[in-house]
Design a protein with these regions (language model features):
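Conserved acetyl-CoA pyrophosphate-binding loop and the N-cap/start of the following alpha-helix
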Residues: 109, 113-121
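A short beta-loop-alpha structural element at the N-terminal edge
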Residues: 16-28
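Conserved GNAT acetyl-CoA-binding A-motif
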Residues: 119, 126-137
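Helix-loop element at the rim of GNAT/NAT acetyltransferase active sites that forms part
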Residues: 30-48
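Conserved catalytic-core motifs of GNAT/GCN5-like acyltransferases
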Residues: 135-138, 150, 155-170
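A short, internal acetyl-CoA/4′-phosphopantetheine-binding micro-motif in the GNAT/acyltransferase core
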Residues: 102-111, 139
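Acetyl-CoA-dependent GNAT
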Residues: 49-98, 102-106, 119, 180-181
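Terminal substrate-recognition subdomain of acyl/acetyltransferases
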Residues: 1-14, 168-181
């Protein structure tokens, strides 16, 4: 196990647990991903694009857990998955000092301190790996995300215009941010 489970208090006083994802979470993770992808325009997939089976997800989780280069954390409240975050270290020798982070939280749990907690845990893991730079991408309309990343010390370093186009034609740029650790 790469990460020790940790209980923490949400801003509303409820207690939840952040822990490494486990193979037993596969079926619930697929349903969680379908839900969370339908709650925000700022994730890469629509719910109908989440087509993998629980078995395929279990194999993916197993691979994450067997690799030191990837850590996926989940946040659990009363036995329910409510958020996830991932860090993936770049594999090439010249780039192994870098790690990419990603985060998603169910809408009903936004503004409760979960994103901050997950990203801090991922940063702690990155430091254990000896990484010196964290990277992330977010979409230009995601003001809530931008505020979180700014608060945690990420800085904008690039932008890809029209990176996604929604079903209604709305276009968002992809913003690249980095943080030295």
């Amino acid at each position: 196990m790469k990460s020790t489970p940790e209980n923490f208090e949400l801003k509303d006083g409820r207690m939840c647990t952040i822990r490494e994802i486990q193979v037993k979470d596969a079926e619930e993770t697929v349903e969680y991903l379908k839900t969370v992808s339908g709650e925000s325009d700022f994730l890469n997939s629509y719910p109908e694009e989440i087509r993998f089976s629980a078995e395929e997800e279990a194999n993916l989780i197993k691979g994450f857990n067997e690799s030191d280069d990837t850590l996926m954390l989940v946040v659990e409240l009363d036995g329910r998955l409510i958020a996830n975050g991932t860090i993936t270290r770049f594999r090439r020798k010249k780039m192994r000092h870098r790690g990419n982070v990603a985060l998603a939280v169910l809408k009903e749990f936004w503004n409760k301190g979960i994103g901050t907690k997950v990203l801090k845990c991922l940063e702690d893991y990155a430091k254990k790996l000896g990484l010196s730079q964290l990277e992330l991408d977010y979409y230009s309309g995601n003001e809530r995300g931008r505020l979180l990343y700014d608060k945690l010390g990420f800085i904008q370093v690039g932008e890809t215009p029209n990176a996604i186009i929604l079903k209604d034609g709305t276009r968002y740029s992809s913003i690249k941010m980095v943080k030295s650790i």
